[in-house]
Amino acid sequence: MNLENVKFNTDTKLVLNIGDPMGKTNAPRAYNKLFGELDMNAIMLPVEVKKGELPQFMEACKMLHIRYISPTMPHKKDIIPLLDDVDESSRIFQSVNAVRIDEDGTSHGVGMDGKGALNAILSSGVQLVGKEALMLGSGSISGVIGLELSKHGIRKLTILNRTVEKAQEIADILNTHTSMETKALASTPENLDQAAGTAQLFLQVTPLGMA
């Protein structure tokens, strides 16, 4: 990996990607490539932090003046009580994957999954206002994507999942916090055909293809 952009001095921004286990994480490779393309004096390193060790880890980061943390599983939810504030999507769906620690020690968490997904959709020129969307899957990012869809004008969202109870939990939260109509259905061929017949946007957020 080309690290010519990293000066390895006191101005170098150190970003710690934390989780357990960390053997297969691809985030440092992706972020360090981006840092290089942007000529940023920054580097991301993977750090294995065991479940239950987050309080000590956060204190160590403050002591060592480490400003940026990228939590992955199982810390996306567990880190929230240790932060001073989080953004709306993180608060509603209890998932943070970017943390900034200011010089005074205050910590701020945001969730980027929903925003990233919406940026990808909008960059393709898709118009969302007044449209109906169909989402297949109800994993950890489904809710935050749904929240962003509502902010960008989606009128109705149907979530299909093999375990309909999981989809219903997300639908209930979205119906409580947004004006978008959201319903959950079991993932059957009949329900898929019916929902697809009126949807203008399809989102595949199941684990299929992640391996």
Predicted ranges, named:
Residues 73-78, 141, 207-210:
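Short glycine-rich anion-binding loops that position phosphate/pyrophosphate groups of nucleotides
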Residues 19, 108-114, 126-154, 161-166:
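Glycine-rich adenosine-cofactor-binding loop
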Residues 2-124:
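Phosphate/diphosphate ligand-binding glycine-rich loop within oxidoreductases
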Residues 180-211:
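Rossmann-like adenosine-cofactor binding region
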Residues 14, 43, 132, 155-156:
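Residues at the starts of beta-strands that form the adenosine-phosphate
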Residues 170-181:
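Short, conserved SAM-binding/catalytic segment
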Residues 69, 133, 202-203:
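Receiver (REC) domain switch-region micro-motif
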